[in-house]
């Protein structure tokens, strides 16, 4: 691995660290830096992959350090991820609102992760996560709440916070928590969800749009929250939603953004960093591995955004220019890394040196 990539990334990690970079914390930052650079360059999430391109001359020593870092109780979100994502979160909130999307996905060996992302432009960015052992299935509602509470302090009033989620996240406790914290939400629910029609309690499926309209809106349908049946264009079946927004059309418009988290999972796995091929096991270790991959994702997508703004003569050195408008920033940056590494390196160096102003 180029020493310049390692050094510039380490300088970035040190400059943005919320803890003074000395002693054990500096040592942990150096190990993280090696794993992060390896993940970016090799696009792999295996233990061997994230330790194969570090500045260590002894690959066996690098592998042991990577294992220790992933297992360490000190390798936490507060110290090694939050300080580096806060600038992007603030940028996303610059227009007075932030959109959060929550969903689960299988990651690592025999583990499933509950992921909270935020929307920046047309892309979902990883924000926080909880990992547990087991195959994909619903998380307990308390875990949903634990994840939201973990990031609550990042969003100061009067920013508008909007939470989107599928049918797993329609629980009454989660909705009550959102209401008590002035968060708005649009959450999918089942057609069998019982709601109050005023004169009777009946399944939501009883509601139907007036002919010529795409949705029907039922006010105060359940514990003060509203219900929507949405038969949008391209929907083979109607979508049933719960929301505390007062306008049905607005709720449907926001809910469309929920599906962006699917592209995030795809980028972290098969179309990006191959997290699905990692054989790392154990909830704590997989959670730490996701931290490395999430940081690699953030840096790579930011470089991709920079590349999107470059003139054609720069882009044509590594990609067909006519393909760029529809290409994801992650893929664009990775193509640049694969075909013109020195060019990609120059953008990573620029990003690491100007991280604070990148979001201004």
Report each predicted region and the residues it spans.
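Short amphipathic alpha-helical segments
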Residues: 33, 47-48, 63
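Residue-level signal for short segments within beta-strands and strand-turn junctions
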Residues: 70, 118-120
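Short, charged amphipathic recognition helices of the HTH superfamily
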Residues: 42-52
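Active-site- or DNA-interface-adjacent structural scaffold in DNA-acting proteins
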Residues: 40, 54-56, 60-109, 165-166, ...
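Short glycine-rich loop/turn motifs
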Residues: 110-116
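Single, function-defining residue in the core of a domain
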Residues: 1-44, 81-82, 93-98, 109, ...
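Short acidic/histidine-centered micro-motifs embedded in hydrophobic/aromatic stretches
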Residues: 53, 69, 267, 271
């Amino acid at each position: 691995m180029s020493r310049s990539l390692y050094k510039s990334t380490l300088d970035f990690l040190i400059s943005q660290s919320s803890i003074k970079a000395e002693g054990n914390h500096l040592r942990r930052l150096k190990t993280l830096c090696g794993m992060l650079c390896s993940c970016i360059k090799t696009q792999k999430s295996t233990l061997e992959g994230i330790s194969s391109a570090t500045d260590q001359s002894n690959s066996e020593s690098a592998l042991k350090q990577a294992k220790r870092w992933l297992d360490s109780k000190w390798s936490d979100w507060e110290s090694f991820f939050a300080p580096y994502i806060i600038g992007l979160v603030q940028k996303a909130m610059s227009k007075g609102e932030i959109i959060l999307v929550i969903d689960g996905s299988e990651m690592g060996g025999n583990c499933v992760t509950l992921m909270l992302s935020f929307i920046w432009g047309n892309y979902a960015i990883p924000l926080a996560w909880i990992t547990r052992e087991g195959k994909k299935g619903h998380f307990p509602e308390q875990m949903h709440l634990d994840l939201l509470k973990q990031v609550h302090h990042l969003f100061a009033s009067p920013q508008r916070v909007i939470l989107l989620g599928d049918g797993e996240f329609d629980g009454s406790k989660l909705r009550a928590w959102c209401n008590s914290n002035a968060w708005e939400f649009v959450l999918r629910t089942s057609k069998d969800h019982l709601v109050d029609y005023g004169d009777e309690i009946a399944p939501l499926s009883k509601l139907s749009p007036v002919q010529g309209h795409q949705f029907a809106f039922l006010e105060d349908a359940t514990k003060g929250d509203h219900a929507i049946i949405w038969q949008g264009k391209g929907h083979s079946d109607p979508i049933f939603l719960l929301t505390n927004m007062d306008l049905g059309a607005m709720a449907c418009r926001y809910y469309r953004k929920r599906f962006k988290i699917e592209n995030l999972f795809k980028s972290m796995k098969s179309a990006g960093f191959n997290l699905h091929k990692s054989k790392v096991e154990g909830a704590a270790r997989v959670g730490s591995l996701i931290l490395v991959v999430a940081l690699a994702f953030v840096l790579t997508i930011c470089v991709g955004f920079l590349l999107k703004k470059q003139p054609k003569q720069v882009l044509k050195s590594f990609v067909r220019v006519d393909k760029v408008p529809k290409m994801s920033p992650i893929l664009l940056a990775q193509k640049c890394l694969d075909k013109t590494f020195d060019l990609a390196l120059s953008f990573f160096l620029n990003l690491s040196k100007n991280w604070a102003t990148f979001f201004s």
